[in-house]
Amino acid sequence: MNTLNQQYEEKVRPCIDLIDSLRSLGVEKDLALPAIAVIGDQSSGKSSVLEALSGVALPRGSGIVTRCPLELKMKRKKEGEEWYGKISYQDYEEEIEVPADVEKKIREAQDKMAGNGVEIADDLISLEIASPDVPDLTLIALPGIARVAVKKQPENIGDQIKRLIQKFIKKQETINLVVVPCNMDIATTEALKMAQEVDPDGERTLVILTKPDLVKKGTEETVIDIVHNEVIHLKKGYMIVKCRGQKEITEKVSLPEAIEREKAFFKDHAYFHTLYNDGHATVPKLAEKLTLGLVHHIERSLPRLEEQIEEKLEQTRAELERYGNGPPTDPAEKLVFLTDKVTAFTQDAIRLTTGEELKCGDGLNVFSTLRTEFMKWNAHLNHLGEIFGKRIEREVAQYEEKYRGRELPSFINYKTFEVIAKEQIKQLEELAVKRLKNIGDAVMKVFIQLAKSSFTGFPNLLEKAMTKINYIKNRNESTAESMLRTQFKMELLVYSQDRTYSSSLSDRKREEQQREVDSDQGSVISDNEERSIVYSTDNHATLQELMVHLKSYYKIASQRLADQIPMVIRYQMLQQSAIQLQREMMQVLQDKEKSEVLLKEDFDIGSKRAAFQCRLERLMKARRFLTEF
């Protein structure tokens, strides 16, 4: 049946075996493999084509016959060797003794996977046939496209089937084999429409025309034009076959005899003999074309397949590293495992305070948050200083009325200066405490994220760490608040080194003088205005001087607070929190009886780790297969 020469035949089987081996490993769960998917409308002759290729009877009948994807693996044996069959699905595998049992075994498999009815399932049934009469070829047969639901079928059975077909044919690695009866208008065939949607350029679509004996007289030339690629152009083209009809099945015409009848039909046909002569007709020619096409497709796909396997291996290793190792079963090893987990977490907590790279919690950086918050605090101090200065300038008269005592004009009362300075600085206290609480929440959030990264899959251990983090945060926040309030009590002493204050005062006076010069330039002052200014200067000299002193001192105090408040917050909420967290978590290790509870793993995490481990193993095997190919 196979007309390939010996030299090429030696190349065919290894190529197809390679992909079959990868598929049997389950690699198709991870990436798309080169394949040929067979699709067609119901009663298009799809089963007949597969029967003719495989030499065994497959489920037939009206309605949905193929209810699960059927992987048909055909292996050509040497002349004289015995027929061999095997069916496998899910975790079940069974050898088939005689070809006559194949149909029954497929029906049994479909019933187990899709139920005893008319439902469909996505799971693959694998049928392996080895015989001298089959080509080296692997096909995946998909359910026939149903237009309307019948009997006990779900109303959306058509949509279900289309979704299943789409899952296979949309992959760029799949050659779409579309079966269309000759007596149907090819342009309206649902199967071809679906193939064109995913392959608009016809790069990977091959059409098989069936039932040529049912072609109406006068339309033969149209069929010939279609096969010659003159109606709907497809790069892989068209083939035409004549398989056993129902009459021949009833008459028990054997498949080998049907092949001979097909050959005679095309050779003797008044119109279709040209298709036979061109190599576009008969099942053997189809088998040859498919085998050659699949091998060529596999060879072209191998480089990309190798790349995909390497990419998937890298991703899988990263996932396994993220989930970490599962807890050991030995009690002594469990304690070591727990100690390592906790130690790694606390060391990362310390690293957070120094900005070093973490083992867990990639991307966590508390300093970006601290820097932003502290910059806001500094900006807030500057903004309030500007408001304070403008308010003093605006309310000079009110300040004189409120604070001036028995002193004569031009005398500065230190008590007045002190009261105003204290009043302004006191307003900053609650703002500093609010900043503390904001930063405390942000730091706690980072520590919790670190705990989640470190204790993935161990909910009890994570809960214990989060409890400790929350407790330490509240305790240190209280301590930090006390320190901040003490700082503000000290600020009410109104103090600065003489040299520092004198320097600030000189700078401020120069700024004020320059501002007056700038405002006076270009203005013409009348005699009355001049007298008014003199009077104002005499009347408010004290407050003008006081304003300069207040601005100078506020600058010193705000600079001090701009540094001191962040230092207190960082020391208590970050440095001390990390050290105390390390101490508290190490105390957890002292209670050895609770290690069992702490290491109780989340079921989902354990199953995901196992799944990733299985994926890693099959990808490693797949890479080895490709390397050895």
UniProtKB/Swiss-Prot annotation:
<feature type="region of interest" description="Disordered">
    <location>
        <begin position="504"/>
        <end position="523"/>
    </location>
</feature>
<dbReference type="Pfam" id="PF01031">
    <property type="entry name" value="Dynamin_M"/>
</dbReference>
<feature type="domain" description="Dynamin-type G">
    <location>
        <begin position="30"/>
        <end position="303"/>
    </location>
</feature>
<protein>
    <recommendedName>
        <fullName>Interferon-induced GTP-binding protein Mx</fullName>
    </recommendedName>
</protein>
<feature type="region of interest" description="G2 motif">
    <location>
        <begin position="65"/>
        <end position="67"/>
    </location>
</feature>
<feature type="region of interest" description="G3 motif">
    <location>
        <begin position="141"/>
        <end position="144"/>
    </location>
</feature>
<comment type="similarity">
    <text>Belongs to the TRAFAC class dynamin-like GTPase superfamily. Dynamin/Fzo/YdjA family.</text>
</comment>
<feature type="compositionally biased region" description="Basic and acidic residues">
    <location>
        <begin position="506"/>
        <end position="518"/>
    </location>
</feature>
<dbReference type="GO" id="GO:0051607">
    <property type="term" value="P:defense response to virus"/>
</dbReference>
<dbReference type="GO" id="GO:0005737">
    <property type="term" value="C:cytoplasm"/>
</dbReference>
<dbReference type="GO" id="GO:0031623">
    <property type="term" value="P:receptor internalization"/>
</dbReference>
<dbReference type="GO" id="GO:0005886">
    <property type="term" value="C:plasma membrane"/>
</dbReference>
<dbReference type="GO" id="GO:0005525">
    <property type="term" value="F:GTP binding"/>
</dbReference>
<dbReference type="InterPro" id="IPR030381">
    <property type="entry name" value="G_DYNAMIN_dom"/>
</dbReference>
<dbReference type="InterPro" id="IPR020850">
    <property type="entry name" value="GED_dom"/>
</dbReference>
<dbReference type="GO" id="GO:0005634">
    <property type="term" value="C:nucleus"/>
</dbReference>
<dbReference type="Pfam" id="PF00350">
    <property type="entry name" value="Dynamin_N"/>
</dbReference>
<dbReference type="GO" id="GO:0008017">
    <property type="term" value="F:microtubule binding"/>
</dbReference>
<dbReference type="InterPro" id="IPR027417">
    <property type="entry name" value="P-loop_NTPase"/>
</dbReference>
<feature type="region of interest" description="G5 motif">
    <location>
        <begin position="242"/>
        <end position="245"/>
    </location>
</feature>
<dbReference type="GO" id="GO:0005874">
    <property type="term" value="C:microtubule"/>
</dbReference>
<dbReference type="GO" id="GO:0003924">
    <property type="term" value="F:GTPase activity"/>
</dbReference>
<dbReference type="Pfam" id="PF02212">
    <property type="entry name" value="GED"/>
</dbReference>
<dbReference type="GO" id="GO:0016185">
    <property type="term" value="P:synaptic vesicle budding from presynaptic endocytic zone membrane"/>
</dbReference>
<feature type="domain" description="GED">
    <location>
        <begin position="543"/>
        <end position="629"/>
    </location>
</feature>
<dbReference type="InterPro" id="IPR000375">
    <property type="entry name" value="Dynamin_stalk"/>
</dbReference>
<keyword id="KW-0547">Nucleotide-binding</keyword>
<feature type="binding site">
    <location>
        <begin position="210"/>
        <end position="213"/>
    </location>
    <ligand>
        <name>GTP</name>
    </ligand>
</feature>
<keyword id="KW-0963">Cytoplasm</keyword>
<feature type="region of interest" description="G1 motif">
    <location>
        <begin position="40"/>
        <end position="47"/>
    </location>
</feature>
<dbReference type="GO" id="GO:0098793">
    <property type="term" value="C:presynapse"/>
</dbReference>
<keyword id="KW-0342">GTP-binding</keyword>
<feature type="binding site">
    <location>
        <begin position="40"/>
        <end position="47"/>
    </location>
    <ligand>
        <name>GTP</name>
    </ligand>
</feature>
<feature type="binding site">
    <location>
        <begin position="141"/>
        <end position="145"/>
    </location>
    <ligand>
        <name>GTP</name>
    </ligand>
</feature>
<dbReference type="InterPro" id="IPR019762">
    <property type="entry name" value="Dynamin_GTPase_CS"/>
</dbReference>
<dbReference type="InterPro" id="IPR001401">
    <property type="entry name" value="Dynamin_GTPase"/>
</dbReference>
<dbReference type="InterPro" id="IPR045063">
    <property type="entry name" value="Dynamin_N"/>
</dbReference>
<dbReference type="InterPro" id="IPR022812">
    <property type="entry name" value="Dynamin"/>
</dbReference>
<dbReference type="InterPro" id="IPR003130">
    <property type="entry name" value="GED"/>
</dbReference>
<feature type="region of interest" description="G4 motif">
    <location>
        <begin position="210"/>
        <end position="213"/>
    </location>
</feature>
